[in-house]
Structures are given as C-alpha cells and as structure tokens.
Amino acid sequence: MDSLPDAILQYILSYLTSARDVAACNCVSKRWKESTDSVKSVVFHRNSFESIMETDDSDSIVRKMISSSRRLEELVVYSPFTSSGLASWMMHVSSSLRLLELRMDNLASEEVVVEGPLKLDCIGVAKNLEILKLWGVLMMSPPKWDMFPNLRSLEIVGAKMDDSSLSHALRACPNLSNLLLLACEGVKSISIDLPYLEHCKLDFYGQGNTLLVLTSQRLVSLDVQGCSWIRVPETKFLKNLSISSVTGRVYMVDFNNLSSLEALSIRGVQWCWDAICMILQQARDVKHLFMKVEFTGNEALQPFPEIDFVEFFNNHPKLQTFDIHGAMFAALCQKNSLKKLETGFTIPCLEEVVITVRSPLNAEQKMNTLESLVKYARGLKRMVIRILRMKSNHSSADDFCDDICKFRHMNEHLVHIE
C-alpha cells in the first residue's frame, strides 16, 4: 500500500464505511490519516463505544471523525448519542449529507423522552438529505423541520406519535417517492398527500382502528397494517397491494381504479363482508391473490357466506397464483358453490394454488372443489394442500385425511401435502 500513489490510496480508503476501520487507518501513518479525509460514508455500530462509559465522550469522537472528512455524504449512527452531540455533528456535515440513519432510542427511558424531540429538531438543518431513516422515535410534538426538498425516502421504525405531528413531518417532505412507517403507535387518523409517492408501507400499532386517506398519482406498491378505514382515490398505476389487520376489523376499503393491480394480499382476523366484496370486485385483473381472513361480520364474528366457484374464477380470469386459507376455502365448498359448473367452463391462467385446510367439516364438498380445480385449471402446475391445526378427535378427520392422500396419489405430479 505504501508504494501506491496518493490518489489511488485515497480512492481505496474512500470505500471504508465502518468507523472502527477508519479509526484504525488513522493510526497507521500520517499519510493514511490524511487519506481518510476522502471517506464518504461512516457507520457507527451499536457496540462502537462499548468501552466508553460517558455518552458525551462518544459524541466528541463522532464529531472529530466526521469533521475530518472533506465531504461526508452518508452517516449511520446506531450507538447512543445526545441531542447536543447530534447538533454539533450537523454543524459540520449538514450541507453534504445525502443519507442519515439514526437509532434515536427516544423510547428507552423517561429521561431520554424529555430530550427526544430535540434530536428530531436537529435533523432539520440537513436540507440536502435524500434518504432519512430513524429508529425508536418519539414524535408527540411537531418536529421543527422547514423543508427537505431533495428527500426521496423516509423510513421510521418504532415510534410514538400523534396525528398532527406525523402530518407536519410529512408536509416537510413533499417529494417523497418511498415512505415506510413500521410499528408506529398513536396514529388515529391520517391524510397523506404526496404527489410523487411510489412505494408506501404503513404499519400502525395499537387497536387497529386507524383511518387512512392516501393520495398519490404515482403509487405502485402499498402495504397497510392496522387500518379499519382505507381510502386511496388514485390507484391507476398500483401493482402490488397488501392490507392486513391483526387486532381490529377492516370496515371499509375504497380504491378508485385497480386496473393495473397484479398482486393482492388481504389478511386479518375479521373483515366486513362488504369490504371483502369491494376489494375483490375492484381487483378483477389480479394475477396473484393471497387471502387469509378468518371471519367476517360487522360486529360479531361470522363465517364467510357461500361463494360461487364459477362466478369467482370468471370474475378473476387472469389469476395465476391463488393462496387461500380456511374460511375462504370453506366458502368455495358450500352446497351450491359448484352448481354452475358446465363443460365450457375453464380457469385459463391458474398455475399454482395453495390451500390451507383447518377443518374436516363438509369433507365431501371440499374434495369436490379440489377435484374441480384440477379438472378445470388446465394449466395448473402445482397444488399445495396445507393441513393446519385440524382436530384429530373429530369423527371425520381420519377419513378426510385419507381422501386427501388418495387425491394426492391420483395427481402426484401436481399435488403436494404439507
């Protein structure tokens, strides 16, 4: 390395990212120390200062290291820091930073919670940020952010916030194309209007009764968890949609246009039947469908009503992969579900189906439905039958499992049992 020209040495060292590696290079020689000023990205891992007791000391070490860089573009800090330390860092590198990722740890203790919002305020001076990632955020008051005109990606993981604070933060990021909010607690009603947003993942933690209104003409993928009412009026380019609710009910979903939708996933303990019907009706051209909803009903838990097998597949002619769990499969296996079957009926595009069976009840109809899938889906390449938590003490359980095994042997090139 000593025989290399300065320019090549600087070029090689500029690819260092770990703060410990940069610090080690500074100790090699004066020439190496001077060459590390070309480092553009520095990562301080969680254990970077495990031998240092005082956070103020680690703050000063970070400041010295980042201030020695001519143009630091990416700063990632997982180690503990104070708001005053962050403010001093931003004074040195705010104009050049493009990516900032911070483990805020605002939720760790009451003492930190008091100073937490100040950390958010310090970030506001980094006007040229393109990517901002924050972990463990307290946002119970609006952050003092003016505007991030270049910010394209905002990710917040683990947060306590209220509606007005989140709205204020998003207004400071008008040009976002990627928004990720995971495990965010306290949001009850949020309206998001981001004209350039393409990818959005929202995970609201709590009772699962959040109201969401999202407006973006460019939206391509949307993943929502924890919302009971969802309205997205502009979805002309939406290709991937996932809606789930672990704790609450999904009462209403309103999407204006799902003509481009290719993949749809709906999950949850309970969805209102109107919401299920609406989303399935709007997603007529979907190619990949995943359904894991246990019950329907506006208040009390209700089983799925009967679904006509022929109408369902006629309404989704482009379906290629279909993953259905207990309740939906049972709805397709009712007494009259197969009554419209006729010789001209086909399922033209279906290639793979995964079926989760949880009950031996209505076994004969379930076997008829499985046989119909094989018969009418001429292009079927794979069928997976998952037997999950079936109560073996039920009188018909053994017979049903025997029937499934026989069905598998008759179609061993297609059918797999898990």
From Swiss-Prot:
- Positions of the F-box domain: 1-47
Gene3D superfamilies, sorted: 1.20.1280.50, Ribonuclease Inhibitor
* One Gene Ontology cellular component annotation held by this UniProt entry: plasmodesma
Q: Which domain of life is it from?
A: Eukaryota
Q: What name does the UniProt record give this protein?
A: F-box protein At1g10780
Q: What lineage, starting at the top, does this entry show?
A: Eukaryota, Viridiplantae, Streptophyta, Embryophyta, Tracheophyta
